[in-house]
Amino acid sequence: MKYYLYVIELDKSVGKFPKFRSKNPNFLFGSSCFYVGQSAKIPLLRFKQHKEGYKSNSYVKRFGIRLIPEFYEKYNPI
């Protein structure tokens, strides 16, 4: 079975949330933030699923902006 790596840019405002900061103690407020995942689904479909709430990471659902294909295209499919 093929798997795909994907990288999603998160809005920088995610850093305002205490729960996020507690899970990411080295996060510097105002810096770029990314979510990295893998799936049997192609990245665009998986991003849409995150945004719709299907098996979604709560930060991606709320703060996901866009896929960053230049970070993962060269590795796919795994």
PLM features: what roles do these ranges have?
Residues 41-44, 48-78:
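Aromatic/basic micro-patches that form nucleic-acid/chromatin recognition or nuclease catalytic surfaces
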Residues 1-48:
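GIY-YIG nuclease catalytic motif and its immediate N-terminal context
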